[in-house]
């Protein structure tokens, strides 16, 4: 069954999102991203008025939300730079200052400049997952001193994980 949830921001503005009881916080955050353009990793949600933080991957109904409910949205600007490590194919790690709102493509440009390898000749992975150029770094849960791996593309038409050439 579908219902509307009120999302209230600290500045006082409110908006509605359509949900179902089986939806999780991750799905709610995706709806909020579509509505106001704030990435999911920047969203902190809490039940109004209790202030209890919502748990990711838990159905909204299990957290006491239903028709007529309101959640508070706090947006983390993620302005502070953080240092991460990028390990190249020779096993050497270099430190990079990044912001979580930067895209993977921006980090690849930085790595390309330092490593002397064109950015279309490598891809980056974190915790075994390939990083998508168009996504912000914050979508991957990077923390200070996280290690990202640089993977060189093989000559001769090899493909990277995900089937891209």
UniProtKB/Swiss-Prot annotation:
Arranged from A to Z, the UniProt key words for this protein are: Antiviral defense, Cytoplasm, Disulfide bond, Host-virus interaction, Immunity, Innate immunity, Isopeptide bond, Repeat, S-nitrosylation, Secreted, Ubl conjugation pathway
Which Pfam families does the UniProt entry name for this protein?
A: ubiquitin (PF00240)
Region named Involved in the ligation of specific target proteins: 153-157
**What does changing residue 83 to A do?**
Does not affect ISG15 signaling, interaction with ITGAL or activation of SRC family tyrosine kinases
Instruction: Enumerate the propeptide ranges.
Output: 158-165
Reported modifications of this chain? S-nitrosylation decreases its dimerization, thereby increasing the availability as well as the solubility of monomeric ISG15 for its conjugation to cellular proteins. Induced as an inactive, precursor protein that is cleaved by specific proteases to expose the C-terminal diglycine (LRLRGG) motif. This motif is essential not only for its conjugation to substrates but also for its recognition by the relevant processing proteases.
Report motif location: LRLRGG. 152-157
The site feature described as Interacts with activating enzyme is recorded at 153
Q: What induces it?
A: Strongly induced upon exposure to type I interferons, viruses, LPS, and other stresses, including certain genotoxic stresses.
- Impact of mutating residue 44 to A? Does not affect ISG15 signaling, interaction with ITGAL or activation of SRC family tyrosine kinases
Q: Which residues carry this modification: S-nitrosocysteine?
A: 78
Q: Which InterPro entries match?
A: Ubiquilin, Ubiquitin-like_dom, Ubiquitin-like_domsf, Ubiquitin_dom
Residues of crosslink Glycyl lysine isopeptide (Gly-Lys) (interchain with K-? in acceptor proteins)?
157
Please tell me whether the keyword Coiled coil is annotated for this protein. Answer: no
What function does this protein fulfil? Ubiquitin-like protein which plays a key role in the innate immune response to viral infection either via its conjugation to a target protein (ISGylation) or via its action as a free or unconjugated protein. ISGylation involves a cascade of enzymatic reactions involving E1, E2, and E3 enzymes which catalyze the conjugation of ISG15 to a lysine residue in the target protein. Its target proteins include IFIT1, MX1/MxA, PPM1B, UBE2L6, UBA7, CHMP5, CHMP2A, CHMP4B and CHMP6.
This protein's domain notes = Both the Ubiquitin-like 1 and Ubiquitin-like 2 domains are required for its efficient conjugation to cellular proteins. The two domains play different roles in the ISGylation pathway: Ubiquitin-like 2 domain is necessary for the first two steps allowing the linking of ISG15 to the E1 and E2 enzymes while Ubiquitin-like 1 domain is essential for the final, E3-mediated transfer of ISG15, from the E2 to the Lys of the target protein.
As annotated, the protein's associated disorder is: Immunodeficiency 38, with basal ganglia calcification: A primary immunodeficiency predisposing individuals to severe clinical disease upon infection with weakly virulent mycobacteria, including Mycobacterium bovis Bacille Calmette-Guerin (BCG) vaccines. Patients are also susceptible to Salmonella and Mycobacterium tuberculosis infections. Affected individuals have intracranial calcification.
Q: How does it assemble?
A: Homodimer; disulfide-linked. Interacts with, and is conjugated to its targets by UBE1L (E1 enzyme) and UBE2E2 (E2 enzyme). Interacts with NEDD4. Interacts with PARP12; this interaction inhibits PINK1/Parkin-dependent mitophagy. (Microbial infection) Interacts with vaccinia virus protein E3.
**Protein's UniProt name:** Ubiquitin-like protein ISG15
